[in-house]
Amino acid sequence: MIEFMDGLKRSHYCGELRVEHAGLEVVLTGWVQRRRDHGGLIFIDLRDRTGIVQVVFSPDLHEEAFLKAEAVRNEYVLAVRGTVRERPEGTANPNLATGQVEVLGCELRILNRAKTPPFYIEDGVDVDENLRLRYRYLDLRRPEMQEALIFRHRAAKSVRDFLDEHGFLEIETPMLTRSTPEGARDYLVPSRVNPGRFYALPQSPQLFKQILMVAGMDRYFQIARCFRDEDLRADRQPEFTQIDIEMSFVDVDDVLELTEGMVARLCREVAGLDIPRPFPRLSYREAMDRFGSDKPDTRFGMELKDISDIASGCGFKVFASAVAGGGQVKGINAAGCGSFSRKEIDDLTAFAAVYKAKGLAYFIVNEEGVKSAISKFFTEAELSAILERMDAKPGDLLLFVADKPEVVAASLGALRLHLGERLGLIPEGTYHFLWVVDFPLLEYNQEEGRYEAMHHPFTSPRETDIPLLESDPGRVRAKAYDLVLNGTEVGGGSIRIHRRDVQEKVFTAIGIDREEASEKFGFLLEAFEYGTPPHGGIALGFDRLVMLLAGKNTIRDVIAFPKTQSATDLMTMAPGPVAEEQLRELHIRTVLKIRERERLTAR
């Protein structure tokens, strides 16, 4: 029989009980982790979000409670009244925080029964992730999942406390806004009362937080929900959370210093990490040159080395032609990997090809010098210079790519990370934060034949570069910055444009004419005419930051109800079909249904 809690009020959480509670009568509530019969006694491990405690039922002391306990099964929901006592000598469980005590149950109420779960509710069980997502309410009962969400809560609280102490106001911005160009595709929401018109869910609160600066709010933050209808790459979510920050009357150093303080405090309070400050800074160009990435993992070496000057006059045409055509020749030193087999090197070549490298040249360094099919094309002086540049020693494997700078960076940067993981060069439990600064404002899209904003079109150019917007847009430098942790971008921001004339020049440079700018961003441009202060800010990816600090492998493990890589919710089966009547109210017809009807009619 299902019972109610009338008269029983929880006094303690299961995981709180210790030896000092011995002799105390307590009321506990929770789920049955397991039930065991031993020598006329029934032992129930009762679990709540704080932990597990053992409850003992004896027929000699409380027969009614004992009889109920016989009917209990895993995941039943119980309320128990009993007395805390030290466990008998030799029966303590060192694996439990409550392992020195147990509760002698005198009253038991079965508040709800449970079917047999499709997987064990405990850590360390190998369960298919789709099954976990289908039964997310069961998956979230597991201690490691509950700990992850508690960790996330504490991280959010740390951020809120820090920003509140530094004069920030938490202000909510609209979830229903208008669609704007640039960036990923918007999630669109049809307006019933405005037929044929659509809202968009925000990809970020960017424009609203800038307008809050125009409004004189001075310091704003929000732990904001954002939405992007993009093709999901590994470990992305269509809806995500970011720590959104904006400040008036600041420069780059002000934003970076405040962010470092917030992140360092979060790491200390939530993860117990002492992060040194200030964070190192790398220019965008230096990051690309040394690591082949604008989000470098600096926990290990194996940096890219440029040998273009040496290779330009060599007899190996692949190298010499690449340099002559404006390309580069760069390499990495896989120290100690000179024993790699030809197949292993071929596998590395195939890996680099994924990033458009046309080939992977290699030198195996030995005591005599270099073993390579291409060494004959180099003079002794050239080989010696290459070995010195690469800091090569006998037993090393040198890997080279000759191509356009972007291909060299992408392929060697990815190969560096691949080898770093494969060779165990990346230390566990270390956290390297750094800033990447001095980005170009724009990048050229070869396919569309136009410039695009590298970050977003509201990023301020350096004042000295503003004249270049009309004459040489590719040379304009941005007041932008990215925060990188262990090779993952966890945040990005900039000083913003606060003058209408500069904003219009940037729009023109990226192919947005005055008419389109007025239609899409007229409200922002008009706001800039009413006394806009200089301002800047940053947005940190909260899901990813929590994942990295919690030591998880995927952001899905720090989000309560994540979507799959195909943007579906396996628990609710969203997205799903809607009734024709709902579509009519929204003045929408689905093309798929029309096409199906046409196909059937054509038969």
Curated annotation (Swiss-Prot):
Lineage: Bacteria, Bacillati, Bacillota, Clostridia, Eubacteriales
Residues binding ATP, per UniProt: R228, D229, E230, Q237, E489, G541, F542, D543, R544
Enzyme class of the recorded protein, top EC level: ligase
Cellular component aspect of the GO annotation: cytoplasm
Organism: Pelotomaculum thermopropionicum (strain DSM 13744 / JCM 10971 / SI)
Compartment(s) of residence: Cytoplasm
Protein name as it appears in the record: Aspartate--tRNA(Asp/Asn) ligase
Known catalytic reactions: tRNA(Asx) + L-aspartate + ATP = L-aspartyl-tRNA(Asx) + AMP + diphosphate
Function: Aspartyl-tRNA synthetase with relaxed tRNA specificity since it is able to aspartylate not only its cognate tRNA(Asp) but also tRNA(Asn). Reaction proceeds in two steps: L-aspartate is first activated by ATP to form Asp-AMP and then transferred to the acceptor end of tRNA(Asp/Asn).
Pfam families: GAD, tRNA-synt_2, tRNA_anti-codon
